């Protein structure tokens, strides 16, 4: 008979309540020789095999009918590699013992993970296919410092939490285990006995692949290979480059017409890439594609931050999808949500029985607007989980930029909270200092480790220095959405033209702060939902005027300083609000001479013109790149300005936001010569009235608007025209 561990310990191991399984299971040196213990429920017979010789060394005694086996080897003193020959009810199987392997995390990883500065935590935590001591399998690691016991459960062990309890690394609260023989594609979860003794089944926070709702398990999947960061893609994100973004929700851009089912990543790669290229957009921005349990969140309530959603295919399919865009010369932006997460039981909520990933105080940790939980940015491990995820998408999938959602909700503790419902910071202020530090760290890390990779903030307040570097007191973003400009200009466009003269400043106010941040001008998904109506439907007037207003507005927007963003469907003036559960109304484009086709052509030509003429983008963030020519003609609702590039080349832009044509309208210009009409939103090609300046016009030596020369123009009704000197 062997010398058994304490009976209470055996009972705890069998019941799945023993926190230190490696101290009992496996091979151990004792005063009487080697002792080997194993927990193999349902096994009928277990033999110990010397791996080197392949010979059976000894039979393990069944010390408990619930599956606890042990043997004492009095003649052997030194540990050796071994296996078990296990006889089940109908077969005999040679298996490796997970409890013969040593620790997995290296000291440097332990230090960096605890400090919260591990650049690639996803290389150590989660599930990783590997070979250990020449044995193929999977290493598992999960952070749950307050758990009483953590086990890996899955298809490979009948989802039985007794079979594979993990080792706790007390120095950092990480549980780890190497499971031989486990393969890619198998389902798994972590079974946690939390600090209160309650059993919880949790998906892997670092899983690279996950089941689609309503299922909730993680899937073992290889870590994606690194994607090369090319100079061309880096340059395309530069402040002096043209950036025109097509914002897309993959689940509703287009669907199968026969069953309204989603297109796959592969089908989207074939259709969406070609369309974006044809339309002249330089970038595509994807609403969140992280795995998420609720379709109606549009992806903005993710649980599987490291797993591309299975709705459209596999992680490799998504990676190929991104590569297809890159082959077409289009950069890919991913909407990223580090501000909150849903409270689904299988997710991060009370992960080990405590508020581990979220703030414990609901005044800090509960988001009232979305019924979600807020990450605890004060914890090193949480910051590392999020910052590592940002780098993961860039390094492993080739994502070129991240657009960070709801930044204001992160950096203000009183965001959407009444008096008494929020907790001040250490200094008594309303700023979330931990979130600010997290954003600065993440942005700085991306800037250093992924040159050319950029971040874009959806930040709706006037928080100063969003796009300033952290060492200058800023948050370190590269770009910021200009929500104020969007609201002001849309409010202006909604006015009846006869009343626009009273709101003239709405179109000019944006230039007063245009150089305080690196702005993107966004017409996003948020502007075509929740009863706001479509952008087209906001335009006043009859059908002709609605479409003319929209074309004129887009022309003004594309010429205004700031990079551009347009949500899908807006490029062809979809008439209804966006519905995430069905395709865009592509049938509106069936009429080649229709209104919607005209708007689509206009946006396409705007994009190609935008890329062709450097004055429209090169000096977006420098005062030298813009000059008002006509800023105060509120009576006629006319605006005129010029854009200039670094070489002094200029492009003139004039908008008439009334349905009244303006004849012989004089606009001062810096230089004499012939000015060619590059674009005219009133062209018949775009379904306008075809009024204009016969393709071009010569300047006159008549001073106007503080310039010695001027143009005598015909301004079509509800129009924007572009003019360039020469040609």
Curated annotation (Swiss-Prot):
EC number(s) recorded for this UniProt protein: 2.4.1.18
Catalytic reaction equation(s): Transfers a segment of a (1->4)-alpha-D-glucan chain to a primary hydroxy group in a similar glucan chain
Keywords attached to this entry: Carbohydrate metabolism, Glycogen biosynthesis, Glycogen metabolism, Glycosyltransferase, Transferase
Pfam families, per database record: Alpha-amylase, Alpha-amylase_C, CBM_48, GlgB_N
One of the record's GO cellular component terms: cytosol
Biological process, per Gene Ontology: glycogen biosynthetic process
InterPro entries: A-amylase/branching_C, Branching_enzy, GlgB, GlgB_N, GlgB_N_E_set_prok, Glyco_hydro_13_cat_dom, Glyco_hydro_13_N, Glyco_hydro_b
NCBIfam families referenced in this protein's UniProt entry, alphabetically: branching_enzym, PRK05402.1, PRK12313.1
Assigned protein family: Belongs to the glycosyl hydrolase 13 family. GlgB subfamily.
Stated role: Catalyzes the formation of the alpha-1,6-glucosidic linkages in glycogen by scission of a 1,4-alpha-linked oligosaccharide from growing alpha-1,4-glucan chains and the subsequent attachment of the oligosaccharide to the alpha-1,6 position.
Assembly, per entry: Monomer.
Protein name stated in the entry: 1,4-alpha-glucan branching enzyme GlgB
UniProt source species: Yersinia enterocolitica serotype O:8 / biotype 1B (strain NCTC 13174 / 8081)
Gene that specifies this protein: glgB
